[in-house]
Amino acid sequence: MLLAVPSKGRLQEPTLKLLEAVGIRPLASDERALVVPTSWSDVNLIRARPEDIPYLVESGRVWAGITGHDYVVESGSNVAEVLELEFGRGKLVVAVPRSSGITSVEDLPPGARIATKFVNIAYNYFAELGKRVRIIRVTGSVEVLPQLGIADAILDVMATGTTLEVHGLVPIATVLETSARLVVNPQYVEHDLTKKLVTFIKGFYAAQGKKMVFLNVPASRLDAVLAVLPAMEAPSVTKLAKGDVYEVFSVVPEDVLPDLVMKLKEAGARDIVITPIEKLIV
């Protein structure tokens, strides 16, 4: 089945990194190939512009895709956003030149020229406000257009605000908040492949910032060690084959490890081993 991934832009690299982390690795290195087999035998990647992915998924020819919430809203496509991903966050804002003195959308003059690639979002937003504006469709960078006198304002995604600042622009309104989403054709929401992909992505995210800690504990010190060892539910405890010693292991937040290790040693733990967690399926 086909999984659409961004072929360009700010979502491309983090999307491919996420898929690799969950075990979906492209098996072809030729970037000119639009359809690429992967290490998951039931998944092929199809490279597409992020703004086109909602349409591809809606068609049913493509089972799922990763794109921005802003592109989903702009397209108006009938797709299910089954999972919000932890990248691509930003705000779709209206921004004007700092020198304009405009501080709100209400201050925009009648017929103000708004440059954007989010034409549908812009039209609906200003229509709801009852503002008469002229929408200028742009497919590339919009930030320079006010400087050129082509637009009075822009409507675009702001991640950090640095690009706006460089071009002398300031945001005056937030239209919507966005982030990367896993989108699925509605008929595939309950499909086994969708459930598998969602499970592995959630498992990858759940493992972030956590480590697996293994330690050996003499029976006489077991209660003292368990009293200081955090766990998701309860630490796992196994009696070793020799001696009156137990192996204890637990999933632990990484940020508590420095102090925790010292407390465990003081409580009587020894042979402490700390390992990464690739995925945590809950």
Swiss-Prot record:
Q: Which reaction does it catalyse?
A: 1-(5-phospho-beta-D-ribosyl)-ATP + diphosphate = 5-phospho-alpha-D-ribose 1-diphosphate + ATP
Its annotated pathway reads: Amino-acid biosynthesis; L-histidine biosynthesis; L-histidine from 5-phospho-alpha-D-ribose 1-diphosphate: step 1/9
Q: Which GO terms describe its cellular component?
A: cytoplasm
Q: How is its activity regulated?
A: Feedback inhibited by histidine.
Which metal ions or organic cofactors does this protein require, according to UniProt?
Mg(2+)
Show the coiled coil region(s): none
InterPro entries from the xrefs? ATP-PRT_HisG_long, ATP_PRibTrfase_cat, ATP_PRibTrfase_CS, ATP_PRibTrfase_HisG, HisG_C, N-reg_PII-like_a/b, N-reg_PII/ATP_PRibTrfase_C
First-listed, main subcellular location of the protein, grouped into a coarse class: cytoplasm
Q: Which domain of life is it from?
A: Archaea
Give its localization. Answer: Cytoplasm
Q: What is its EC number?
A: 2.4.2.17
Q: Which GO terms describe its biological process?
A: L-histidine biosynthetic process
Cite the GO molecular-function annotations of the record. Answer: ATP binding; ATP phosphoribosyltransferase activity; magnesium ion binding
PROSITE patterns reported for this sequence? ATP_P_PHORIBOSYLTR
- Pfam families, A to Z: HisG, HisG_C
CDD domains noted in UniProt: PBP2_HisGL4
**Do you know which HAMAP family this protein is assigned to?**
HisG_Long
Annotated family: Belongs to the ATP phosphoribosyltransferase family. Long subfamily.
**What is its biological role?**
Catalyzes the condensation of ATP and 5-phosphoribose 1-diphosphate to form N'-(5'-phosphoribosyl)-ATP (PR-ATP). Has a crucial role in the pathway because the rate of histidine biosynthesis seems to be controlled primarily by regulation of HisG enzymatic activity.
Q: Which NCBIfam families match?
A: hisG, HisG_C-term
Q: What is this protein called?
A: ATP phosphoribosyltransferase
Q: Which organism is it from?
A: Pyrobaculum aerophilum (strain ATCC 51768 / DSM 7523 / JCM 9630 / CIP 104966 / NBRC 100827 / IM2)
